[in-house]
Every structure is written in C-alpha cells, then in structure tokens.
A protein has these predicted regions:
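Flexible loop/turn segments at secondary-structure boundaries
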Residues: 40-41, 151-153, 179-185, 239-245, ...
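Contiguous, structured surface segment used for ligand recognition
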Residues: 2-138, 455, 467, 471-497, ...
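Short glycine/serine/threonine/alanine-rich loop segments
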Residues: 55, 169, 228-230, 349, ...
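Active-site neighborhood of glycoside hydrolase catalytic domains
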Residues: 245-251, 255, 260-364, 370-382
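Generic recognition of stable, solvent-exposed alpha-helical segments in well-folded globular domains
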Residues: 44, 99, 156-159, 213-220, ...
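Flexible, acidic glycine-rich loops studded with aromatic residues
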Residues: 351-365, 370-520
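Feature activates predominantly on carbohydrate-active enzymes
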Residues: 76-270, 275-280, 284, 288-298, ...
Length: 520
C-alpha cells in the first residue's frame, strides 16, 4: 500500500489498495443512494460526516455515493467490503451490513483529517480515486475495558466505541463486576449496586469511589455500538472476584454470618461464592437480566483466579463435592463453571471465560488465554474456540516504556508498541485444525491505576492501533509499514482529541517485550 501518501495511510491496513488517477469531491449537492439493506450504513455516514463537514449527504435515488448490499458477493464474508472511488462517483459494496460499516470507516480515513473533527473552514472534502478490496483476517478483534475497578461515565463508553469502530474493532468486552465494584443494575438484587457499587477507598487513598449504570444507559450503549458494527459483550465475574456481590448479599458466600465490605485492595481476593443452590439461583437470575440487556452471542463469566481455600475449609462445600462425585473441593470450580455454562447454552448463548492454563474450563466455553501463549494451543487442542489475550502483548495497563515520565501503571515490565504489533493471534507452527479454532485477539485495560478517560487513552493509544492493524490484516505483519502509516494516522487521532502517548524514536524502536508475568 502506498503509505507515503497520507491519504492512503489507512489503519488497519486494507487487503488490497490500487490507486487510480483523480479525486472525488464531496460537496453540498453530493447525495447518497442506499440500496435495500444499506440504509444503516448510509445513516452512519451522514451521522459521522454531516456535523464535521457541514455536508447534508442527502438521500437520493440519483446519488453519486452509492452503498450496495449484495449477499451474492463472494469472498467478502461478514465484514469484508469493496470500495471504488472514481472522479464522478463512489461505490461501496459488501455482502453483509457490517461490511458496509467497515467501508464507511475507510471512507472517513480517506478524507482529510479535519473530516473527523469539524470546525474547519475552506477545506475541500476530497477522496483520492482508488479501488480497495478488504477482508479481515480474524472475526474477533476486541478491546476489554474494566469499569469495575474505576467506573467511567456512559458518555465516555460511547466515545470508546467510536474510536474502536474507526479502527475496525468489533467487540467491546465490558468488565462490569469485580471485588472492587458492581456496575450493572439487577432488578432482583438491588443491593448489588446500592451497596456493591460503592467502596470506601482505593488502597489507602481515603477517597470513596462509586458508580453504576442504569439499564437505559446500557441499552443505549448497545444500540450505539450496534449502529457502528461493535458487539458489547458483558462480563459478570464468578465464582471468584465477587467480593462486591458478597458485601451486598453475604448469604452467597461460604460464611453467611460474616459481613464484608467492598474490597479496597487490588490483587486476588480469597473470598469466593459458596456452592449452595441459592448461589446458582442468584447467578442464573443475574444472567437472565444480563441477557435481556445484551444481545451478544457471547456472555463472559470470568472464571479465573478463584482460590479454593474457602471451599476446602467449608463442610457445606466438601459435602457438595462428595455429592457430585468430585475428588476434592478444588474440583468444584469446574463443576460450578459447567453449571453456569450449560445454563447459558440452554438460552442460546456461548459461555466465555478466562483460562489460566487453557485446560480448566468445560468444553462448551470460548476461552480467553492470558498467562502463556502455549495455553491458547492447549485450549485449541481441547476443542475450545480461543481468543488469544497474552498479557505480554495485549495488556495495556502496563507502561509503554521504562521512561520515568510514564503515567502510573501496573507493576511489571513494559508492553511496548512493537510487542503489540508483532503479536500473532495464530503463532507460526500451529496446525490447521488448531489455527481454525482461534477467533482472534483483543486488548485488555485493567483499571486499578487508570482513573480517568485521559489515562485510558494515554495507555490505550497508539497500542490499540497496533493490535487493530495486526488483528485485521493478519499475516506476519509489517512493522516498518505500520510505523509509517501510524505517523500519518496521528493526525486523525489529533482531530478526534485522543490523548495518546506521543510517538518517540524509542517507542517506535523494534525492541523485544519483557518476560515478567504479574497477575492480571
């Protein structure tokens, strides 16, 4: 791709770009013709470009901007598209609606960066003539945002989705509950947010922290994301990482008589759910309300970092293990996840969970492996669908360098830009059957030390640009080409007001990642 021309410095990199002579100019009289099924993409085009360019882009059967949905188009899959820009007309085609939405983002990037910001005067809204054929390498290209440790307003989640969509990412993994906070309202259990949504402080700072979304806000977020081709996958942690839930409803724990606070520390809490039937009823009821809010085919239920000490010491848990024919109380973890997974499958959803080894979740689970790349292969060999999330390449809560002026971040070696871009969701040497089970990859941003949107964006960008580029383009990657395109792409980030970490010679160096393995 001719990245030396700024208008062709597209990110992520399209599959095939063939420049043509000439320019196509959008003007006040430029109209949009949306063929049947393409109306949503046309609406998005107007929503994104109208306020910033001042162009109406009115619908018309004679419009020179044509959006066409053709299910018979071969080789494009669910998200591929073809874009032809000529001097007199623009044609965007796809086999599925999401493909048109991806093409709309490419049109945005072909325009001057001012088309993303608004307020510019005297700009000619021109696109270079070009032919683009583009299909993603992986169907899962995600970003996980932890709003349990530090709550973020729903208005910022809308912006987060907008930035994801610009980079053709398609799954927002929303981490809604943890030991330190519960952010989703559950009508059947109102104390989850009235009590579990508040903690006295973070570590020893003495500053209370609170927050919860309304169901209307979450429905609005899902709708906003869907209009941009992004699925919101909720995560409700269980059977560990549940201290906030136990603060609200102590009877769900292994010591019902004990009164707990919402946890104020970070790390792994040894307080976990009990395994009595009331706990399973609670989980099923919560998940029913989750499924009512989130149409995502995947529902994440956490599952990792669950100490079994309380079960080993609990007569009730030992009795449950014996009654279920388990060898030891520690085996209750797999039993618990199996019960929850079966419930989600019965409701037409795909249970998803974190895996510490790749082999501990029931077979119906889609597995996110984070500790070691080899665990992804273990899970694939067991027949799981896999989303690779190796912490040394996808955890954006680690610093981007060892520079002393970096913002506070998770303890551990840095995860530099190069480590993110060179991470292949399907490492070389995997067999075809193993590789076919990898859905893709995603970034993670745990927010123990990330308190504000400014810090979120500093830690996220430009590293999320790197992950988006590799997840969409696949292959062995082109670091030098990515760096060249990224230099131009920062003008778009500037136009959008993204508070990204500035590019430096050091950050663009091809250095290897560290090897430490701190907890998530």
């Amino acid at each position: 791709m001719p990245a030396s021309r700024p208008e062709f410095s597209l990110l992520p990199r399209p599959g095939k770009v063939s420049p043509r002579p000439g320019r196509f100019v959008l003007g006040q009289d430029t109209a949009v013709r949306a063929l049947p099924g393409a109306e949503g993409a046309a609406d998005l085009l107007r929503t994104l470009l109208g306020p910033t360019t001042g162009l109406p882009l009115s619908p018309s059967p004679d419009g020179r901007v044509v959006l066409a949905l053709d299910p018979q188009l071969g080789g494009l899959g669910d998200e591929g598209y073809g874009l032809t820009v000529g001097p007199q007309a623009l044609l965007l085609r796809a086999a599925r609606p999401d493909g048109l939405l991806r093409g709309v983002q490419t049109i945005r990037q072909l325009l001057p960066p001012e088309a993303l910001s608004g307020g510019a005067r005297g700009i000619s809204w021109e696109l270079p003539c070009v032919e683009i054929s583009d299909v993603p390498a992986h169907p899962w290209r995600g970003a996980m945002l932890d709003v349990a440790r530090h709550f973020q307003p729903v208005s910022y989640l809308h912006r987060y989705v907008d930035l994801m969509a610009l980079h053709k990412l398609n799954v927002l993994h929303l981490h809604l509950t943890d030991d330190q906070g519960w952010r989703m309202p559950v009508d059947a259990y109102p104390r989850l947010t009235s009590v579990g949504g508040h903690r006295a402080q973070s570590l020893s700072d003495g500053v209370p922290h609170s927050g919860a979304y309304t169901k209307a806000e979450l429905r609005g977020l899902v709708r906003h994301a869907r209009e941009r081709g992004v699925t919101v996958m909720p995560e409700i942690e269980m059977p560990g990482h549940v201290r906030a839930a136990l603060a609200a409803y102590p009877g769900l724990g292994n010591h019902p008589e004990r009164r707990l606070d919402v946890w104020t520390r970070w790390g792994v809490c040894d307080t976990v759910f009990g395994v009595h039937e009331e706990v399973l009823d609670f989980c099923r009821t919560v998940l029913e309300e989750v499924m009512d809010l989130f149409p995502s085919p995947y529902i994440h239920v956490g599952g990792d970092e669950c100490p079994t000490t309380e079960w080993e010491e609990s007569p009730a848990a030992r009795s449950r293990a014996a009654a279920e024919g388990l060898d030891a109380p520690g085996d209750l973890h797999g039993w618990f996840m199996g019960r929850i997974g079966s419930f989600l499958v019965e409701h037409g959803r795909r249970p998803t969970g974190w895996a510490e080894t790749g082999g501990e979740l029931p077979p119906e689970f889609t597995v996110m492996t984070w500790r070691d790349p080899e665990h992804a292969r273990t899970a694939a060999r067991r027949g799981h669908q896999v989303v690779t999330a190796h912490h040394r390449a996808t955890y954006l809560d680690y610093a981007q360098s060892t520079d002393p002026d970096e913002l506070p971040a998770q303890d551990g070696d840095p995860v530099p830009l190069h480590a993110v871009h060179t991470n292949d969701p399907v490492p070389r040497g995997w067999g075809p059957d193993e590789a076919s089970r990898v859905l893709g990859t995603q970034a993670q941003l745990w927010t123990e030390y990330v308190t504000t949107p400014d810090r979120i964006e500093y830690l996220t960008y430009p590293r999320l640009c790197a992950l988006a580029d590799r997840a969409w383009s696949g292959g062995r990657g082109d670091w030098a080409g990515f760096v060249e395109r990224l230099r131009h792409h920062t003008a778009r980030l500037d136009a959008l007001g993204v508070r990204y970490r500035p590019l430096t010679t050091r950050s663009l160096a091809a250095a290897s990642a560290g090897t430490a393995r701190p907890p998530r």
